[in-house]
């Protein structure tokens, strides 16, 4: 029988994480860890660390939060595969402290990005100062040299960036074959400084002289020597992806070589574009859309859930069979996103969600709806996802041996 897409463990994550392999019966490391920890708004943390910070004393409150997070991040590092990555959502209250802490636990050189996520497009209207409209996503590798995270997405490709159309209907754009970065030049990359031949009338390009072709060497706009982005063997292999054109530069008209950069390289596969470090609500969803999608499943029972679109974008950077861990599971967004992504692309991702039995606030929508603890919300959502999206669900006891 196939493993379910979603597994839930109720318990304090500091107790659960060291025994997670024993609890799940699987020692394999995790490819992706995502967490959305408490944002340190001044309330006590619902974890049994015997750590408390005075809400009025800023320094001690930050110290208490960091002390709460440190052992959990260390445990997460130990559970990560060497090729894996961790992503942590955070707001301005602790973004600076979290970054320093993760630099210490994972290594500054392992930091892959600090993404600004536009979760509140209207901006927070309460309080003084600017109307804050974003949070952050800090992303670190366990070993950046081996990390398999692919920071690109097919969804970020804008067809308007590809204005040219080939006779067969394929869209493309012209990119200079010349490397435009002056760090790469005949001194630093001598093997990429060579001449090719092109005919600006027909557009044809070859590595050797032909017909009415003219010799073209790579130069910068000011006429200084440059290098190509492609090696000579690659030009021999893909001459039809190149075109020779006349252009006007600072030194007057000249002949140059361009690459046809295709929107779709073949009939079955599209192209991917590097993700920027600003993620808009229109792309990944907002807090409002997250509340709405949770309301459809279990009701309006959680104040600030994350949208599944945010997690699906993150999941899209990892292999489609990734093992995923969320040990601040909250409303269960990560597990929901895993199921949606698997259903969309045929992947076999599996997610383990851990959440404590933190009591819901007295008089809150969640308590009125019958959810005594936040873990009850997590459980209800993941069960509902299994029923509606598929993939199965299991709950494991944190006390099993």
Residue ranges and their predicted role:
Residues 16-21, 98-100, 334-340, 382-386:
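Short, well-ordered amphipathic alpha-helices
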Residues 92-95, 332, 399-401:
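Short, internal active-site loops enriched in acidic
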Residues 340-401:
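PRPP-dependent phosphoribosyltransferase catalytic core
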Residues 155, 252, 329-331, 394-399:
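A glycine-rich phosphate-binding loop feature that marks nucleotide/adenosyl-phosphate handling sites
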Residues 311, 324, 334, 378, ...:
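Hydrophobic, well-ordered secondary-structure elements that form the walls
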Residues 1-323, 345, 358-361:
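Class I S-adenosyl-L-methionine
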Residues 73, 331, 382:
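Short amphipathic alpha-helical/adjacent loop interface patches that line ligand
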Residues 322-341:
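A phosphate-binding catalytic loop at a beta-strand-loop-alpha-helix junction
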């Amino acid at each position: 029988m196939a493993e379910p897409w979603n597994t839930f463990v109720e318990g304090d994550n500091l107790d659960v994480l060291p025994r997670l392999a024993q609890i799940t019966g699987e020692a394999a490391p995790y490819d992706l860890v995502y967490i959305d920890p408490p944002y340190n708004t001044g309330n006590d943390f619902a974890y049994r660390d015997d750590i408390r910070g005075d809400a009025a004393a800023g320094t001690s409150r930050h110290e208490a939060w960091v002390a709460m997070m440190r052992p959990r991040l260390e445990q997460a590092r130990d559970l990560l595969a060497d090729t894996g990555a961790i992503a942590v959502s955070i707001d301005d209250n602790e973004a600076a402290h979290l970054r320093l802490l993760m630099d210490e636990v994972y290594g500054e050189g392992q930091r892959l990005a600090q993404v600004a996520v536009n979760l509140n497009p209207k901006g927070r209207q309460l309080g003084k100062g600017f109307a804050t409209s974003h949070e952050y996503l800090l992303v670190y590798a366990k070993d950046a040299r081996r990390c398999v995270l692919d920071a690109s997405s097919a969804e970020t490709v804008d067809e308007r960036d590809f204005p040219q159309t080939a006779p067969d209907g394929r869209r493309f754009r012209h990119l200079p074959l010349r490397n435009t970065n002056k760090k790469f030049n005949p001194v630093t990359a001598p093997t990429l400084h060579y001449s090719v031949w092109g005919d600006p009338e027909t557009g044809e390009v070859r590595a050797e002289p032909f017909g009415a072709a003219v010799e073209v060497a790579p130069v910068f706009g000011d006429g200084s020597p440059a290098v190509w982005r492609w090696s000579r063997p690659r030009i021999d292999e893909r001459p039809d992806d190149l075109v020779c054109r006349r252009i006007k530069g600072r030194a007057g008209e000249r002949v140059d070589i361009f690459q046809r950069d295709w929107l779709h390289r073949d009939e079955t596969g599209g192209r991917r574009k590097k993700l920027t470090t600003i993620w808009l609500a229109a792309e990944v969803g907002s807090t409002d859309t997250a509340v709405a999608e949770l309301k459809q499943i279990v009701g309006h029972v959680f104040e600030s859930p994350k949208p599944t679109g945010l997690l699906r974008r993150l999941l899209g950077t990892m292999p489609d069979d990734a093992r995923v861990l969320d040990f601040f599971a909250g409303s269960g967004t990560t597990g929901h996103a895993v199921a949606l992504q698997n259903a969309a692309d045929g992947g076999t991702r599996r997610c383990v969600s851990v959440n404590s039995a933190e009591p819901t606030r007295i008089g809150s929508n969640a308590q009125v709806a019958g959810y005594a603890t936040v873990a009850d919300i997590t459980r209800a959502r993941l069960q509902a996802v299994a029923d509606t999206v598929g993939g199965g669900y299991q709950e494991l006891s944190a006390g099993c041996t």
